[in-house]
Amino acid sequence: MIRIRFGMDVLLVLLLATCLLSPTHGTPLEWDFAVTLRTKIQFMDSSWQTIATAAHEFDELSALTFDESEELIYFNDLKHRNGSIFSLKRDLIAANHVVEQTIARTGNESVAGLAYDPLTTNLFWSDTEQRKIFFASIHGSATPKVLVDLSAEGGRPDGVAVDVCRRKLYWTNSNVTHPTVERIDLDGSNRTVIVNSDIDMPRGIVVDQLSDRLFWIDDLKGVFFSVESSKLDGSDRQVVLKDKHHEPLNLAVTNDAIYWTDRTTRSVWSHPKVPVIRVTTTSKPEEEDSTDATDFKDPEPVAEDCPLVRVANLSEEARGIVARTGFYQRLQKDHHCASIVRKVKQRVDEQSRKFEVSSLLDQKMKVLENERCMNNGEYKAATDLCICPTGFKGSRCEIRECHNYCVHGTCQMSESAYPKCYCQPGFTGERCEVSVCAGLCLNGGHCRASKEENEAPTCECPAKFGGARCEQNSTEICSLFCRLLKHEPEMYVPFGCHSICEELAQGNSTNIAVPQYQHLEVCLTPTVWTSSVIIILVVGIVSSLLLVAVIVHGIRRLYKPKRPRIRKTFVVRKQARTNSAGDTPLTNRPLATEQCEITIENCCNMNICETPCFDPKLVEQTLSKSSCKEDKKILIHNMEDDLY
C-alpha cells in the first residue's frame, strides 16, 4: 500500500508539473492590456491580439483597475443587484478566472473611476451620482468611507488615480461650469487644485510613475478632444495631442505610448508620449530666368506629425482600460518608490506564507514551482506569478531584455529597469539602429563619422559642391551671379565663380557675363618666397646662432675651475746637519751655522721645488713687502748664484 501510495503521489506531481511548466493559452495571465466592454473584459497582448475574455455574466461594466502585486483585476458593474465592485483572478487549478464580490452595493452608485493602493489594499472610486470619492479595504465588509465630498460645491468627480509612491490621490472634476484637476493625500489632508484654467471637461486620468507626470483626457467643446500632461504638481503643462471626432473616456500609459478608449468608434487608439523628431530639407524650385538670390541654410529638426493609430477594433462600446507597467521590476531602484515596493513585496510574501504546507507532496510541488521561474525569479504561489529580477521578463523570467536589443551598441539596464543602448561611434537611435550618415550628405558627398561621441559627422563634397551637407551647388550659384552680372556690371561676384562663368559664357554669351578682376594674375599664382622674406629668414637664423654661441661661452666661463692658490711653508733648523764620512768639499756644500728649508707647493707647474735659503731674514722681509711673482724671481735667482 505504501508503494502504491508513493507511486500515485509521484504521478500526481508529474501531472501538476506538466500543467505548471507547460505554456497556458487563453488565460488572462499573459495579457498586456485589459479593456472593459459593456458585457465583458477583453485581454490583449502587446500586439493587441485578443488572448482571452472574462466576466461574461455582467451586463453593464464601466471602470476597472489593476493590482499588479497580486495579479487582480477590480471592475464595476452598474446593474448588479448586490455588488458594486468585483475582483477577477486566475484559478491556478482550472486555468480559468474567478470573480468575487469586493464592495457591496449600498444604493444607486454610478462608478466612473477606480484606483487601487497596493500598500494599504484600499480601493478608491468616484461616484458621479453622489458627487463623492469613496474608499474601502478589500479585506472585510466595512462600510465605505468618504474621502472627498464635492456635492456642496457642485463638483462632479470622474477619473481617479493613486500615486502609490508619494501617497496621493488625483482626480478630475468634470463639472462644465468649473472643471479642475485636483489632488489630496491618501489620509484626506492637503487638498490642492493643480489645474483650473484652459480646461473644459476632464475625464480619465493616470499617474505615470516612470516619468513622474500626469496624463488626462479633456473632452473639449464641440467635436474636439485633447490629451494633456503636466508634472505631479500641475506645472510644465503640455498638450500631447489635440484632435476631433472622438468621445474618449479613460486612458492608460506605457513606457512610450498613450492609449485611450473611444465610445464613438468602439476602438482603442494610441499616440506616442514624445513626438518623433525627423530632419527635413525644403528646397525651392529654381526658375531659369530668376534674378533673386537664394540663401542656403542648414536644415533644422522638425517635429514629425504623429498620426493616431487605431490599435484595436472592438465589438462593443469601449470604456475602461489598464496596461501592465511592470510595477516590481521598473520601480525597484526609483528613489521615490523603492521603499514602497519593498513594503508591498513584504506584504505579499507574508500572505504567501499562509499557503505553505509541510507534506511530502507539497514539498515536491514547491520545488517544481520554484523551478518554474528562471534566472533567479521569485515564484508567488498565491498568484502563480514569477517576479523577475531586473533585466529579465516573461511569464517564467526566461527572456533577457538586453538580448538582441541594441543593433550597433552595448545594452545595459537603466535605473528605471529598462534596457538602454550605448551606441558605437557613427550610430544613434533608441536601439542604435540609425546611422548618423544616413541621408546626411547630398549630391554624392562622402560622409565621415567622427570617433568622438559629441562631434557631428562631416561631409566630403565632390567638385563644385559645398555646404555642411554638400547641398550647395557652386555651378548653380555662380550661374546666378553670372546672369545678374550681365544686368548689373558693378555687382560683386565671388572669385571662385570666374572659371565657371567662363565655361558658361562659351555656350551662352548673350545671358552670361564674365567678371573682370584687377590683378587677377596675383590671385591665380600667389608668390610666397619673395626676396624680403628670404632676407628676413636668413638674418633671423644668423642672429639665433650668435645668441646660442654667446650663451654657450658664458656657461663655460661660469663653470671653469679656478687656479689653485700657492702656499709657502718655511721650516728653520737651528742645528746644522753633521757631515757624513763620505762628504767632501767637492761633493757637498758648505754648512752654515743656521739652515732653513723652504717647501713651496703648487709652484713650478704643480711640482715641488726644494731650494736652500741662506738668508731667512731677507726672505721674511721680502715676503712682507713683495708679491708672489717677486718671490718667485728671488728664489730662482738664488738658485742660479754660485754659492761656493
Curated annotation (Swiss-Prot):
Gene3D superfamilies: Laminin, TolB, C-terminal domain. One of its GO terms (biological process) is spermatogenesis. Disulfide bonds join 402-411, 406-421, 437-447, 441-459, 461-470. One of its GO terms (cellular component) is plasma membrane. Residues 398-430, 433-471 form the EGF-like domain. Residues 27-531 are extracellular. It comes from the Eukaryota. It is found in: Cell membrane. Its main location: membrane. The chain crosses the membrane at residues 532-552. Keywords: Cell membrane, Differentiation, Disulfide bond, EGF-like domain, Glycoprotein, Membrane, Oogenesis, Repeat, Signal, Spermatogenesis, Transmembrane, Transmembrane helix. SMART domains: EGF, EGF_CA, LY. It is a single-pass type I membrane protein. Glycans are attached at residues 82, 108, 175, 190, 313, 473, 508. Has a role in spermatogenesis and oogenesis. PANTHER family: PROTEIN CUEBALL, VITELLOGENIN RECEPTOR-LIKE PROTEIN-RELATED-RELATED. This is Protein cueball.
